[in-house]
Regions:
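Conserved short alpha-helical segments that host acidic/polar catalytic motifs at enzyme active sites
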Residues: 1-142
Length: 142
């Protein structure tokens, strides 16, 4: 089993009034980036997840443009401190599998076992992501 490190940060915000909450997610991720400094990202409905390597604060100059492009009353965000898988953009979260976007905080100890339940989920040391395995499994059950 991999060595467990500090956890990531997962943020979810939903506006009942339809207000664009993407700027609030930026603020939350920036405030909590000490929980994960490898990568960050967020997802809104009907768009691919937005992900970047590095600190949230290093992208401050882009926030206004990104917030307009991804404007939404519903957002999930994540800062990554990897416990499994390499620090690549592909492993940054949120991840999207079909219509499901997911962000996860923690380690799934039996990820290899779960990956055997979902055919076609390639689980290798290079792209090992317990979150991807969980997403694939959830999608297979829906």
């Amino acid at each position: 089993m991999p060595k467990v490190k500090e956890n990531c940060c997962v943020v979810g915000i939903y506006s009942l009034t339809g207000k664009n909450v993407v700027p609030m997610v930026f603020d939350a991720l920036r405030a909590l980036q000490h929980r994960g400094q490898e990568a960050w990202g967020f997802a809104v409905p009907n768009k691919p997840p937005f992900k970047k390597i590095g600190l949230v604060s290093h992208s401050s100059s882009e926030f206004k443009k990104i917030a307009q492009e991804y404007a939404s009353p519903c957002v999930i965000g994540h800062v990554r401190y990897s416990t499994m898988g390499t620090s690549t953009l592909a492993n940054a979260q949120p991840l999207k599998v079909k219509d499901l976007c997911i962000a996860h905080n923690g380690t799934i100890a039996n990820a290899q076992e779960i990956s055997n339940l979902v055919g076609g989920c390639s689980f290798t040391p290079q792209n090992a992501s317990d979150t991807l395995v969980a997403a694939e499994r959830l999608v297979s059950l829906i």
